[in-house]
Amino acid sequence: MRGFIANSLKPHMRSFALRRSFTSSRILRKVNAVESFGDYNTRISADKVTVVDFYADWCGPCKYLKPFLEKLSEQNQKASFIAVNADKFSDIAQKNGVYALPTMVLFRKGQELDRIVGADVKTLSSLLAKYQE
């Protein structure tokens, strides 16, 4: 099906479709999913600011927030962005006092800097600017 669609597009649209597909996959790699408790600890212990997005697949506001986090990760090269599925890693969520989703927690060197409960992109942007100075 994909080949049929690509072949039926006009040449200039074909390149747009390919470029858009490539760009989306490049951006998606910027918010990395946590694979284990050890992986989580390693990532939040970094010298740079780490934004931890606690989410769940069933959470509507979490889905709304995802593209904004991907865009922020592109714009803030000095910060790292990770995602923790609160259903899969309930122990990590509990350890961090996460009782509402989405919750974003900012860390540096393993220490919590700040926390945002809810899909508040403006506050996250301003906190990133504050802690990256």
Swiss-Prot record:
Active site: C59 (nucleophile), C62 (nucleophile)
Induction: By aluminum chloride and ferrous chloride.
Domain Thioredoxin positions: 30-133
Cystine connections: C59-C62
Site (Deprotonates C-terminal active site Cys): D53
Any GO CC annotation of this UniProt entry: mitochondrion
Annotated site (Contributes to redox potential value): G60, P61
InterPro entries: Thioredoxin-like_sf, Thioredoxin_CS, Thioredoxin_domain
Targeting presequence: 1-29
A Pfam family the protein falls into: Thioredoxin
Disruption of the gene: reported phenotype: Leads to auxotrophy for arginine and cysteine.
Gene3D superfamilies, per database record: Glutaredoxin
Record localization: Mitochondrion
Keywords: Disulfide bond, Electron transport, Mitochondrion, Redox-active center, Stress response, Transit peptide, Transport
GO biological process: cell redox homeostasis; cellular detoxification
Molecular functions per Gene Ontology: protein-disulfide reductase activity
Quaternary structure annotation from Swiss-Prot or TrEMBL: Interacts with arg3.
Known function: Disulfide reductase which serves multiple functions in mitochondria, protecting mitochondrial components against thiol-oxidative damage as a thiol-disulfide oxidoreductase, and supporting urea cycle and respiration in mitochondria in a manner independent of active site thiols.
Stated family: Belongs to the thioredoxin family.
Protein name: Thioredoxin-2, mitochondrial
Organism whose genome encodes this protein: Schizosaccharomyces pombe (strain 972 / ATCC 24843)
Encoding gene, per UniProt annotation: trx2
